[in-house]
Amino acid sequence: MKERSVGFVGGGRITAIFLEVLGGTGLDLDRVTVSDTSPEVLAKRKERFPAITTTADNTAAASCDRVFLALHPPAAKAALPGLAGALGPDAVVISLAPVLTFEKLGGLLGGFARLARVIPNAPSVVGAGYNPVAFGEGLPPAERSEVETLLDGLGTHPEVPEETLEAYAILAAMGPTYFWFQWQELRALAGSFGLGVAEADAALRAMLEGATRTFFDPGHTYDDVADLVPVKPLADAEPQIRQAYRDKLGGLYRKLSGA
């Protein structure tokens, strides 16, 4: 892929993840510009990635060849009209946010149509992400391939229909947060039961890998899997946990998708 300049409009968590991975997979960070309204955020990014250019001017990041829109939807909606004049005719804008469809993005960018949307998730930081991507009709095949190359180091990036991206935001992007605190609690309890850190982590990792493999094994239904362990200490709490999933995640999906 031809060496391109890369801009990040927004310097938050997801930008840090992208820089961490892309910098380790061959992207020349001295061709990267990160813009943000927070001096503290920019200082953190510059400290961790000294080669990048940081600025409070979003148009500087938007003037790059490949532009990642790394803002939450309300902030992106406010910022986009001011970026339209900075975009070059051959630029590509890659939105990392849910909610803002290609139609909305194009309208806010004055008709700019060279667009992609990605829903990234946190395991990308170790190259194990699941980052569904959709391409706007105005983005040619060569540029689509370039976007995919940029995403390669982050993990898997299946091309999906745009209308499914908000579902992936709930399932894959936010999914780790539904489990991480539970795993940490198990890790802490294991220590209180007398296991060392190495022993607890080895057992927890193996259990999670084995449980995942079992859950998705085509030879077992969910009922088969659930019946494999006779003692279920949290069975009394399952109804409340399931209802919390339905209430919280169902409501959030409706908000993101406008359903």
Residue ranges and their predicted role:
Residues 1-56, 62, 128, 189-193, ...:
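NAD(P)+-binding Rossmann beta1-loop-alpha1 motif at the extreme N-terminus of oxidoreductases
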Residues 18-19, 39-40, 48-49, 59-130:
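Rossmann-like NAD(P)(H) cofactor-binding subdomain of soluble oxidoreductases
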Residues 38, 97-100, 120-124, 172, ...:
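Glycine-rich beta-alpha junction loops
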Residues 2, 191, 198-259:
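NAD(P)-dependent Rossmann-like dehydrogenase/reductase catalytic/cofactor-binding core
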Residues 104-114, 130-167, 178-216:
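Internal alpha-helical scaffold of NAD(P)-dependent oxidoreductase catalytic cores
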Residues 27-28, 88, 110, 152:
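Short conserved AdoMet
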Residues 4, 30, 52, 91, ...:
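A structural micro-motif
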